[in-house]
From Swiss-Prot:
This is Large ribosomal subunit protein bL31. GO terms for cellular component: ribonucleoprotein complex; ribosome. Binds 1 zinc ion per subunit. Pfam families: Ribosomal_L31. Keywords: Metal-binding, Ribonucleoprotein, Ribosomal protein, RNA-binding, rRNA-binding, Zinc. Part of the 50S ribosomal subunit. GO terms for molecular function: metal ion binding; rRNA binding; structural constituent of ribosome. Gene3D superfamilies: Ribosomal protein L31. Its cofactor is Zn(2+). Belongs to the bacterial ribosomal protein bL31 family. Type A subfamily. The keyword rRNA-binding applies. It comes from Mycolicibacterium gilvum (strain PYR-GCK) (Mycobacterium gilvum (strain PYR-GCK)).
Length: 70
C-alpha cells in the first residue's frame, strides 16, 4: 500500500437503538457509530418477522374485472 493516502483504521463502538453495542473497526474518526437496528433487535434475526400479502392489489383487480381467459 502507498503510505500516507489511506485513512486510519481504528476500533469503533457501534451503538444500537435497542441498547446493544459491539466493537468493530472502521475509518470513521469519531470512534462511535449509532444505528437504529442491529442483529439483536431486527425482526429477521429475532423471528418476529411479519409476512406481508403482496398479492392484495392483484386479487382486488381480479375480483373487480375477473381473470383473463386465454
Amino acid at each position: 500500500m502507498k503510505s500516507g493516502i489511506h485513512p486510519d483504521y481504528v476500533e469503533t463502538t457501534v451503538l444500537c437503538g435497542c441498547g446493544a453495542s459491539f466493537t468493530t473497526r472502521s475509518t470513521k474518526k469519531s470512534g462511535n457509530i449509532t444505528v437504529e437496528v442491529c442483529s439483536q433487535c431486527h425482526p429477521f434475526y429475532t423471528g418476529k418477522q411479519k409476512i406481508l400479502d403482496s398479492g392484495g392489489r392483484v386479487a382486488r383487480f381480479e375480483k373487480r374485472y375477473g381473470k383473463r381467459s386465454k
